[in-house]
């Protein structure tokens, strides 16, 4: 619950975290960031919150200039519509801004739109394991599977964000 009780408090808390981190020389590359990644997942059973994306994006751009923003909202970088390692064929790096809503179809995100009115790179995210977190009983994907993912993302012109979770000792295994 992030130690807040209302949407208003949550949105203020989130904005304050952005203000603390962005442009601060203690973080990033001497205070410079190239991308802010805003995951839209809330987890099962989580309360629905109406986020103040406009305020957050305004601050992010003020603090970091031409930074790329990954979000479920109409931004410069969009979710590709799945976490399985498959980008659309073809995939377009444009979308129609009005179509990027909470109800957007994953297939639309996966392919983009050749007639789109805004540039939005489809960024692919996938974990090297079957889940996002490390578990002793899970094995990493095989080289064959990773190569297949690579060709179906990067080979189709889509940046790949590969999650490699650390184990309990903090090592990447």
Question: Language model features by range: what are they?
Answer:
Residues 1-173:
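Mature catalytic domains of secreted/periplasmic carbohydrate-active enzymes
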């Amino acid at each position: 619950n992030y130690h807040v009780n209302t949407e208003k408090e949550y949105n203020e808390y989130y904005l304050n975290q952005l203000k603390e981190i962005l442009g601060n020389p203690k973080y990033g590359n001497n205070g410079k960031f190239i991308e802010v990644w805003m995951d839209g997942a809330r987890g099962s059973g989580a309360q629905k919150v109406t986020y103040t994306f406009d305020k957050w994006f305004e601050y992010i751009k003020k603090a970091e200039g031409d930074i790329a923003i990954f979000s479920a909202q109409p931004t410069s970088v969009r979710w590709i519509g799945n976490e399985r390692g498959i980008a659309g064929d073809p995939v377009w790096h444009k979308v129609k801004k009005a179509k990027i809503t909470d109800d957007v179809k994953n297939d639309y995100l996966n392919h983009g739109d050749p007639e789109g009115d805004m540039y939005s790179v489809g960024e692919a995210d996938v974990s090297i394991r079957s889940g996002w977190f490390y578990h002793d009983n899970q094995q990493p994907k095989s080289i064959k599977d990773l190569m297949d993912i690579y060709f179906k993302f990067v080979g189709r012109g889509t940046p790949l964000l590969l999650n490699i979770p650390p184990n309990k000792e903090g090592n990447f295994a």
